[in-house]
A protein has these predicted regions:
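Charge-rich, low-complexity N-terminal segments
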Residues: 1-16, 21-109
């Protein structure tokens, strides 16, 4: 699968709005009610990744799971990354996960 051009990436990103492009990757933080819920999500995500034979970088921090996708052998993003991102997005919906919100700026006085 060929590496996507900048224009192709820009076109693909709206289909995965919770994912953020960072360099040659796309990343999403999923937030769950607790650690066991986060781990259950990771287990389901791992099964999807194994089936697709495309494995994300996974970081678990208590109730937050960060998934990062790139296609290493192509040196950047491919349609494979966006297809798997869409599959991951379908997992937490039924379990109530939400995208992480950026930290606020605090209260203005």
């Amino acid at each position: 699968m060929p590496k996507l051009t900048s224009a192709q990436i820009k076109t693909a990103l709206p289909a995965v709005p919770a994912w953020k492009k960072r360099s040659a990757t796309i990343t999403r933080v999923f937030v769950f009610k607790d650690f066991p819920e986060a781990v259950r999500f990771v287990s389901r995500a791992a099964a999807l990744a194994q089936k697709a034979w495309h494995h994300p970088d996974i970081d678990i921090r208590w109730n937050k799971v960060t998934l990062t996708l790139t296609t290493h052998d192509q040196g950047g993003l491919t349609e494979k990354d966006f297809a798997l991102a869409r599959k991951f997005d379908a997992l937490p919906t039924a379990r109530g996960a939400e995208p992480a919100r950026p930290p606020g700026r605090g209260l203005a006085v």
